[in-house]
């Protein structure tokens, strides 16, 4: 039997086993009514779709059996998934964990306070909420200790970008740069781009629902001079290696044609890495 089929069968079997043993998790807020079950399934589907589209392909993802099944259904490769067993004492070994109600119950507040402080996205509300969390190297304490210095570095890089005569920034983009709210990968790429041509920074954003306030904005819309300028921006991004955006294309907005670009999550906080 093919390896993919074996993995799928394993997920299915362990998912059934997890359901049979759910009573062991006395605090597990498992949905019991048809409406709650439907809501839980919808939250899993939305979270899985977001991960398939927004999370770096190189990242290992921790998930409970049902969530792992939903991720596979969204075409996330089984090789990217690490199933978290009900007996696991901690979520270590993965870079991103899908904090379903079952896993929040299993690890309690330690999930956020010890291991995974950063919320990349969130789906649903109340007890059925699903958070996509980043497991910080060194744990939450180390992560939180680095936040201030990382923001200062992003502010400095933003100031440097704004000082470039080739950069024209909207009020929103200007404010985001000076507040240190822009992803380092965007700062580096836009700095390189501005050395070659004039660019207009329209907006920085992150389309992720429920994203944490400490997560830098990893998307941008960029204007240029005429269609030739936009083509030059696209050509520049295509040629990038280390910092090529995960998604970029030319689109039309109310003010005209722009290039939209976005990096996948999770991204670095500081200019020299995590």
Please identify what each model-predicted range represents:
Residues 4-33:
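C-terminal region of N-terminal signal peptides and the immediate post-cleavage residues
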Residues 28-117, 190-196, 208-211, 227, ...:
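Catalytic lumenal/periplasmic loop and adjoining terminal transmembrane helix
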Residues 94-274:
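Aromatic/acidic, Gly/Pro-rich catalytic loop(s) in extracytoplasmic/lumenal soluble domains
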């Amino acid at each position: 039997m093919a390896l993919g089929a074996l993995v799928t069968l394993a997920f299915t079997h362990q998912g059934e086993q997890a359901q049979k043993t759910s009573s062991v998790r006395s605090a597990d807020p498992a949905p019991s009514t048809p409406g709650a079950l439907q809501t839980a399934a919808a939250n899993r589907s939305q979270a899985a779709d977001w991960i398939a589209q927004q999370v770096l392909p190189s990242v290992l993802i921790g998930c409970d059996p049902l969530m792992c099944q939903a991720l596979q259904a969204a075409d996330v490769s089984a090789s990217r998934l690490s199933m978290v067993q009900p007996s696991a004492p901690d979520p270590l070994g993965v870079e991103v964990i899908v904090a379903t109600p079952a896993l929040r119950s299993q690890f309690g507040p330690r999930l956020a306070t010890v291991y995974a402080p950063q919320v990349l996205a969130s789906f649903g509300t109340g007890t059925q909420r699903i958070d996509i969390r980043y497991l910080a190297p060194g744990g939450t304490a180390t992560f939180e200790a680095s936040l201030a210095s990382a923001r200062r570095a992003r502010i400095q890089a933003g100031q440097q970008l704004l000082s470039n005569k080739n950069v024209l920034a909207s009020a929103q983009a200007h404010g985001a740069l000076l507040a240190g709210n822009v992803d380092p990968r965007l700062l580096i790429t836009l700095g390189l781009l501005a050395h070659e041509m004039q660019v207009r920074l329209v907006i920085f954003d992150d389309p992720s629902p429920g994203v944490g306030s400490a997560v830098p904005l990893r998307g941008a819309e960029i204007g240029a001079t005429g269609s030739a300028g936009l083509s030059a921006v696209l050509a520049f991004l295509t040629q990038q290696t280390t910092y090529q955006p995960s998604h970029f294309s030319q689109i039309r907005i109310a003010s005209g044609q722009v290039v939209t670009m976005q990096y996948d999550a999770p991204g670095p906080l500081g200019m020299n890495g995590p």
